[in-house]
Amino acid sequence: MATVPTRSGSPRQLTTKQTGDAWEVQARRWLEGKGLRFVAANVNERGGEIDLIMREGRTTVFVEVRYRRSALYGGAAASVTRSKQHKLLQTARLWLARHNGSFDTVDCRFDVVAFTGNEVEWIKDTFNDHS
């Protein structure tokens, strides 16, 4: 788990949520540096969550952010399982419906931004609603 120095100088453990939030901020900044525009973060719909929603031109990009300290056991990108993909699809479907859209009417894709150690990997169009 990551640590952060406190005012007293002794490190304090970050919670898993705090660590995840920090990597999501890093991913957002990194993607903005690549020209994407921020739409929303931590979108919750009926038990599912999308880390980031961005726009690239006319495309809505649903982003899953992953972090692993090392590539042992496949690294960050390998941790997006079929089950997780299904949950992301369901959450995106509900979000689109709330915004008067659907997979049939909105150009969208699912990306993964994976941080493994000090490396960042952007996997565009990782999966789709036809996977």
UniProtKB/Swiss-Prot annotation:
Belongs to the UPF0102 family. It comes from Escherichia coli O157:H7. It comes from the Bacteria. This is UPF0102 protein YraN. The lineage of its organism: Bacteria, Pseudomonadati, Pseudomonadota, Gammaproteobacteria, Enterobacterales. GO terms for molecular function: nucleic acid binding. Pfam families: UPF0102. Residues 1-19 have a biased composition (Polar residues). Residues 1-20 are annotated as: Disordered. NCBIfam families: PRK12497.1-3, YraN family protein.
